[in-house]
Swiss-Prot record:
Gene Ontology biological process terms, A to Z: translation
GO CC terms: mitochondrial matrix; mitochondrial ribosome; mitochondrial small ribosomal subunit; nucleolus; nucleoplasm
The name this protein goes by in its record: Small ribosomal subunit protein uS15m
Span of chain positions assigned to the transit peptide in the UniProt entry: 1-57
Record's compositionally biased regions (Basic and acidic residues): 234-243
Species per Swiss-Prot/TrEMBL record: Rattus norvegicus (Rat)
Family: Belongs to the universal ribosomal protein uS15 family.
Subunit structure: Component of the mitochondrial ribosome small subunit (28S) which comprises a 12S rRNA and about 30 distinct proteins. Interacts with METTL17.
Positions of region (Disordered): 228-257
Intracellular or extracellular location(s): Mitochondrion matrix
SMART domains: Ribosomal_S15
UniProt lineage: Eukaryota, Metazoa, Chordata, Craniata, Vertebrata
Record key words, sorted: Mitochondrion, Ribonucleoprotein, Ribosomal protein, Transit peptide
SUPFAM superfamilies membership: S15/NS1 RNA-binding domain
Amino acid sequence: MLRAAWRALSSVRVQAVTQAPVPALRARSSASLPSARCGLQTPSLLNAARAYAVQKPVQAKQDDEPASSTFIKEYKNIIPNMEKVDDVVKRILSLEMASRKEKLKIKREQLMNKIAENPEDYRTLEARIVALTVKIRNYEEHMQKHRKDKVHKRHLLMSIDQRKKFLRLLRQTNYDVFEKTCKELGVEYALPPLHFQRVHRRFLAKKALCIQVFQEVQKLKKQRMALKAAAAAAKKEKRERVPENPSNALPEKTKEN
């Protein structure tokens, strides 16, 4: 929509420039803008065009985000007396100038120190869950900026499914560590349904047809029962009108005569 509005604005400008007299444009060229020369209200048109723009949701800052002033672990161990180094060198060796990979590595180490008993063991289930959580949050930040990136979206969904699998295994083996991991990472684990059946179009159409047939059969049953009740009522009325023994009715007629 912004592109269409910008094209309409440029076409109106071109029409106004072609219709305006040449001397007047030359005289005003040094003193006014192109929008003022054409007599257009540029701010109003731009505001109308900006109204069509979709505002991207702002990603909330995470609590486990490391401070930008922290030093990278490798440089901190190599260089002695890090505090006495120049400020420019400190900034270069800090997370402010670090790559994305190094930031994710430090995030994972911080979470591992909170959760795992042995932070250096990356083969345990809780360590794998921490690594997948850091990766998922990185994918979510990327998807906030690039919504149409299908490759990262697929990797995000695959990582979420894998984390669900590891959480289920950890819940079955060590429930205390599972609770601690979910609490520290801020993850909510939902139990899967007992009976899962993938819904297809054919199944939905068949189910709708069965429901429709059942409703029609119930209607026919009600109509049949109503007809039977009406026939029974008519037969009862007929029996009440006609006497059972006609011989009992003859003496009454003779008495009346």
